[in-house]
Structures are given as C-alpha cells and as structure tokens.
Amino acid sequence: MKQPILLAIIGRAKDTVNYETAFRQLEVNCFTTLNMQDASAATHLLLPGGGDITPALFGQTNHGSYHIDTELDLLQFQALETFIASGKPVLGICKGLQLINVHFGGTITQHIDTADQHRWVGKDQLHYVYHSSLSRLDFFYQLYGNSTLVNSAHHQAIEHPGDHLIPVCRAGDNVIEGLMHDSLPILAVQWHPERILKSGGDILLQYFLSLTAL
C-alpha cells in the first residue's frame, strides 16, 4: 500500500500561507514547521520562498542582500540534509532553489543586472522560461516542453550551479530558473508555482508529489 503523502514546509507560519493553501487545493496534507523531528516524519519537503540567504553561507560578504534570516537559513539547511540522507523528495521554490544550490556548493549573484525584469513590483512579473538541458528527460521538458510562462519575484539568482545540479531552464536573460539533482529526487524552480496553480503551476506541484523516496 502506498504511503500517504505528508508535506513539511520549513518556514515561519506567517510566510507560508500561500503554500499551504495551494497544496491543500491539491488535497495534500501539509504543515509548516521549524521542528526537525516533526519535519523528518514527512514524506516530502518544501523549501519555500522568502528573504535572501545569509551571504556568509556561500562565502561572500553582504553586497546587495536583504530580509536576511540566518536562523531560518540554518534550519532549512538542516531539513534539506535530513531529507537528502533519507532519499526523500525535495522541492525548492524561489529562495528554496537558491538554498539547494548553496548546499551543493553553488553560489548566488546577490543582485542581478536584470533585476527589474524579475523582482516583485507590487505583483509578480511574468516572463517565459526556456528548456536549457541537453537532455529531454528532465522534469521541465517532460512537463512543459520547450518553454512556459512563469511568474517572477526575485532580485538574486544562481551564479554557479552546485555539484550534481543540472540547470533545466533559463529566462531570456540567461538566469537559471530551474534545477534538478542528477541522482536524488530534488528539483527546484525560481518562480512561484503555488501562485499560478491554474496556469501550469499545478503540473509542477503534482509532479513533485508523484516522486517517492529512493
């Protein structure tokens, strides 16, 4: 018998309402927590969007980062490490993509030159992202083909991808918008699928929920 899905969202409750609402619309049991024992009981992990990652965690001084929450960063890294060790599925959204990248040794550009095309302007901005992997077996191509329209609310981006992470899609300015691990059930996107469920976001979230532990 297949184990029921239980999704742990690692964040502060005041910041995760959109995520819980989206997954409950997909009839998924989910909860927000900062307790690692509670999180480890879940079948799936979500690392949500939020402020910027503490630059020291990827070997830089602060030159453009803000809304930093180092305590939360460290708890999210701890949860990620726990799920990696158990081979359970992980999804990173926005900041979550950047956390996953940093965990695997990647770096972040703290303020991209094209930030005005990506950042929050009182609402999400919309732009296309394009398949960029050499393979057609990655999740992005399987779900969306060569391109899809996404929402955007960020001013930072991946500089160098971490070890074993494959960029699967990019924006028109070459910003990496999606990653997957080459052997673990880990994927991440720079956009916010939870806010565009009826415009293709549900496809990605359902795919993530279909993944199982190794």
How should each PLM-predicted stretch be described?
Residues 143-145, 182-183:
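Short hydrophobic "helix-edge" motifs at membrane interfaces and signal-peptide entry regions
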Residues 187-191:
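Active-site-proximal beta-strand elements of phosphoester/diester hydrolases
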Residues 1-93, 101-109, 113-144, 159-165, ...:
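N-terminal beta1-alpha1 cap of cysteine-dependent amidohydrolase-like domains
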Residues 98:
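Cytosolic ligand/metal-binding cores
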Residues 152-155:
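A glycine-rich beta-turn/hairpin centered on an aromatic-Pro dipeptide
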Residues 175-182:
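Short, surface-exposed beta-strand/loop micro-motifs that present aromatic residues
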Residues 157, 168, 178:
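Short, surface-exposed charged micro-motifs
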